[in-house]
């Protein structure tokens, strides 16, 4: 919308690469209305004015009438996300002098090293600004903040838009600007990565009632009173609550669950009443209750009277909130099922939003945020590629783990530069400028940072691709359609109205590549890979084995997309009524059945079982809806054996006389594991012949054939072929045929 001498646009959050850079993202139509080119300077006005440089908007922003600016610029002009601002093109002058003051607490003092003015002048070159703006200087950070902010105290010339030039003199005052730290170290939406969907839901639930209660009045509905954020520790629940409070301009009151509890009668309830009373007096307010499960547990399960009284007090306070819409309660917990059910109903906590473990793209966004002010010594394109690689390595990491990883990487870099630094003197600017954090610093940090959400259940990061598996082309195609497609393209299934398979069973002789196939699926579909090994699950304590299965499926849901791999599933899920182990395996089978049936709500979780003996498995597991597909992995034929040999010799220096075709011909009955062993033994034969050998000859392979024998003979192949034919029949036909053959089902 055009206004005299400017246009009116709606404020949206900045791109993840923009915070602290004074960038203004405008679409082509807005630039045309302003007669502005990329690189021009525009003024943004709401309560106050600020300036920034024009950058190209995302293609999806075209004709939406929005302007993307970061939280510093929003704070400078007094606007929030969703507000309308006036944007106009302005001319800047090169500043002769700019005076800056750090924005820190009044009782703090910063001691800058020599040459700080030159460093700041170079870091801010061509940066547009106005007097009284807050600006961020790349590379300068304060502990606990994403970046150190400065107040533009004075510019010469004054009261006009200026930019820093080569000749601009920078003066930095050591005394802080007259700001409170809470106001400026504000956590904004740009500081939250990988949670855009959840953030959208929370903003709709919280920001709208706080900023525009008239919308709810017009529709004749009452705004929500509360939201519970739940998920593993470190995923960003508290961060979201603070960001929402900051961006909505609401007063933020925090209650840390355990701190509210008191041994004196009635004191815990009194503390709660005081906080709710203060929230209503200073509305609009957000009351944030961290670890809400510690003060509002299920009343029937607690021994103490205090907890029961606190829960009752919280219920009456939430029911009695007068300023509905002006006071919102946000609870955070990682134990949602431990909260009293009376709180978990509409009218109290209206919504429950899961803040889960971030996926690969989410991890990249979080890493972008935490490395925003970090000197990585690489171009934007290289940084982008590197952070994508780091996102691949960090399966199962939550936001707090990624922050710890970045911090540890910086400490690794610091340790490299410490010998050059005299800690008793100010650090010279040239040392500060040459400090960079390298890829090796990150990779070394990865060795010491363990993902917190998966410490109980280790999620493997497979690195097996389809090309690493020789042969089995039909099986690979079937698995891709069954597993990979639903994980990579869920929209196809939604469009065609198909429900993806929940799981499938791979069966065949030992060594044919069942585990390898499962790992390849996880790698190619970018899914987490959780392996359940039978003996690790079994426990002598009643209920512990079932609990282990439940926890694994719960973790799979948290780190989805995930593949749960049950290796040797026949050892933990044999046919019920055939074992004498006091019912442990029967209970495990029952738990598996209920877990598999519960996968309807587990989007992005696929279960793969592997076994050599599907005939002794419990038949209830083999029906559609649990293991939807039974896939037979046959021993490799000649073509498949050749393909497997090529895979295992691709990094092996072969002599010219090596004929893999001939070796494939000679290895009838060899499975994938045998062929891998054969190649290894051939390499060892080459070493035994000559420790300085540079290649492996045909003779080495033929000698290896004398010691490495096939795992599968004609009798085994016949057994599995019969089994494969039987497994493809109906349950009644299958049972009869297996009983006739002396097997059972």
UniProtKB/Swiss-Prot annotation:
Listed SMART domains: AAA, CDC48_2, CDC48_N
Keywords: ATP-binding, Nucleotide-binding, Repeat
Binding site for ATP: 231-238, 508-515
Database matches in InterPro entries: AAA+_ATPase (IPR003593), AAA_ATPase_CDC48 (IPR005938), AAA_ATPase_domain (IPR050168), AAA_lid_3 (IPR041569), Asp_de-COase-like_dom_sf (IPR009010), ATPase_AAA_core (IPR003959), ATPase_AAA_CS (IPR003960), Cdc48_dom2 (IPR004201)
Cystine pairs: none
Database matches in CDD domains: RecA-like_CDC48_r1-like, RecA-like_VCP_r2
A Gene Ontology term for the protein's cellular component: cytoplasm
Name listed for the protein in its UniProt record: VCP-like ATPase
Organism field: Thermoplasma acidophilum (strain ATCC 25905 / DSM 1728 / JCM 9062 / NBRC 15155 / AMRC-C165)
Lineage per the UniProt record: Archaea, Methanobacteriati, Thermoplasmatota, Thermoplasmata, Thermoplasmatales
């Amino acid at each position: 919308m055009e206004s005299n001498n400017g246009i009116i646009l709606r404020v949206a959050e900045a791109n993840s690469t923009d915070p602290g850079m004074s960038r203004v993202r405008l679409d082509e139509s807005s630039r045309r209305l302003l007669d502005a080119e990329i690189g021009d300077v525009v003024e943004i006005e709401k309560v106050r004015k600020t300036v920034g440089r024009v950058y190209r908007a995302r293609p999806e922003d075209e004709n939406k009438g929005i302007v993307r600016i970061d939280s510093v610029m929003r704070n400078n002009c007094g606007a929030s996300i969703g507000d309308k601002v006036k944007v106009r093109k302005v001319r800047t002058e090169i500043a002769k002098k700019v005076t800056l003051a750090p924005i820190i607490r009044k009782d703090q003092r910063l001691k800058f090293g020599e040459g700080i003015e030159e460093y700041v002048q170079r870091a801010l070159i061509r940066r547009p600004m106005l007097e009284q703006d807050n600006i961020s200087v790349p590379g300068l950070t304060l502990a606990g903040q994403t970046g150190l902010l400065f107040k533009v105290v004075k510019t010469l010339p004054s009261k006009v838009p200026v930019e820093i030039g080569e000749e601009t003199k920078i003066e930095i005052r050591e005394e802080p600007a007259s700001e409170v730290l809470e106001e400026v170290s504000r956590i904004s939406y740009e500081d939250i990565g990988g949670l855009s969907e959840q953030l959208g839901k929370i903003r709709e639930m919280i920001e709208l009632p706080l900023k525009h209660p008239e919308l709810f009045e017009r529709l004749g509905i009452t705004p929500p009173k509360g939201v519970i954020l739940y998920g593993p520790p470190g995923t960003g629940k508290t961060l979201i609550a603070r960001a929402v409070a900051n961006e909505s301009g609401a007063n933020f009151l925090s209650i840390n669950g355990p701190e509210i509890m008191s041994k004196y009668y009635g004191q815990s309830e009194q503390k709660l009443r005081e906080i709710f009373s203060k929230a209503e007096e200073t509305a609009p307010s957000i009351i944030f209750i961290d670890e809400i499960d510690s003060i509002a547990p299920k009343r029937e399960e607690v021994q103490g009277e205090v907890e029961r009284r606190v829960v009752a007090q919280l219920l009456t306070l939430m029911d009695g909130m007068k300023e509905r819409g002006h006071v919102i309660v946000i609870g955070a917990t990682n134990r949602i099922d431990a909260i009293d059910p009376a709180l978990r109903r509409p009218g109290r906590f209206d919504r429950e939003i899961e803040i889960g473990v971030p996926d690969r793209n989410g991890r990249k966004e979080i890493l972008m945020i935490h490395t925003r002010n970090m000197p990585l010594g690489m171009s934007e394109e290289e940084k982008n590629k590197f952070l994508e690689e780091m996102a691949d390595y960090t399966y199962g990491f939550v936001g707090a783990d990624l922050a710890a990883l970045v911090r540890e990487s910086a400490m690794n870099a610091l340790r490299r530069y410490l010998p050059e630094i005299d800690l008793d003197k100010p650090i010279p600017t040239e040392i500060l400028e040459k400090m960079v954090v390298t890829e090796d610093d990150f990779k070394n940090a990865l060795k010491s940072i363990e993902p917190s959400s998966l410490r109980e259940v280790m999620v493997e990061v497979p690195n097996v691709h389809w090309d690493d598996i020789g042969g089995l082309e039909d099986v690979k195609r079937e698995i891709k359609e069954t597993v990979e497609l639903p994980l990579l393209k869920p929209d196809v299934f939604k469009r065609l109205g198909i429900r993806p398979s929940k799981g499938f069973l791979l069966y065949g002789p030992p060594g044919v590549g069942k585990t390898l196939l499962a790992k390849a699926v996880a790698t190619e579909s970018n899914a987490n890979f959780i392996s359940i090994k039978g003996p690790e699950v079994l426990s002598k304590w009643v209920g512990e084995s079932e609990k282990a299965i439940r926890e694994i499926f719960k973790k799979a849901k948290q780190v989805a997309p995930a593949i749960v791999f049950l290796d040797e599933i026949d050892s933990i899920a044999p046919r019920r009524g055939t074992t004498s182990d006091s019912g442990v395996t029967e209970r495990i089978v029952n738990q598996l059945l209920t877990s598999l049936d519960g996968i309807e709500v587990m989007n992005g979780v696929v279960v793969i079982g592997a076994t050599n003996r599907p005939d002794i498995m419990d038949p209830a597991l083999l029906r559609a809806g649990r293991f939807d597909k039974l896939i037979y992995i046959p021993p490799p034929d000649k073509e498949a054996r050749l393909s497997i040999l090529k895979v295992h010799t691709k990094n092996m220096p072969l002599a010219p006389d090596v004929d893999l075709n001939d070796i494939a011909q000679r290895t009838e009955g060899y499975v994938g594991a045998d062929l891998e062993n054969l190649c290894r033994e051939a390499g060892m034969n080459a070493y035994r012949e000559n420790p300085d050998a540079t290649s492996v000859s045909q003779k080495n392979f033929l000698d290896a054939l004398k010691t490495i024998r096939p795992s599968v003979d004609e009798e085994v192949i016949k057994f599995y072929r019969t089994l494969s034919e039987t497994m493809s029949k109906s349950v009644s036909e299958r049972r009869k045929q297996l009983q006739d053959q002396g097997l059972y089902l």
